Amino acid sequence: MSHHDKSERRDLSRLTKVDVIDVAAAVDADKLTDAEVFKRTYLGHGSQSSVFVFQGHSGPFRMHVHETHDEIGYVLEGTGTMTVDGVTHPVKKGDVWVIPANTPHGGRFEDAPQVLFISSPIDDPDDQDRVWID
């Protein structure tokens, strides 16, 4: 059958809705303060992944690697650059990056960034998988 034939349906019975989160409200309730270098607001953990919003101040974010997890970032607010494995890329609201484990990366934002991150496997807030390299 073609992709447009509505008589054939995929079985979605195994999918369940766990939670729907208002990201803006979660971030508004957990604002970054001037005393904090950065903040992560965790939105949830699955069996294989974590979702959180990173909030930072304008300026650099040090080069680092994650030894055990891949990282997907979606820019909610902010403009700047991301340096990934030695290559610098401009980033702005709406951009996405995918960074495999053990890939050096860091950034510089011109204004306060908010980035939605998905980490797989889980990024444990109590046992951070981040090694600073500069």
Give the residues covered by each predicted segment.
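A short, N-terminal "cap"/entry segment at the start of jelly-roll beta-barrel domains
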Residues: 1-53, 62, 132-134
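Short hydrophobic/aromatic-rich beta-strand segments that constitute the beta-sheet cores
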Residues: 53, 82-84, 115-117
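Short, conserved beta-strand element in jelly-roll/cupin
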Residues: 55-56, 65-82
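Structural motif
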Residues: 60, 79-81, 88, 104, ...
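A cytosolic small-molecule/anion-sensing beta-strand core signal
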Residues: 76-77, 92-93, 111
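Short acidic-glycine-tyrosine-enriched beta hairpin
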Residues: 86-101
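Ligand-binding loop in jelly-roll beta-barrel domains
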Residues: 101-126
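Short, charged, solvent-exposed linker or helix-capping segments at domain edges/interfaces
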Residues: 127-131
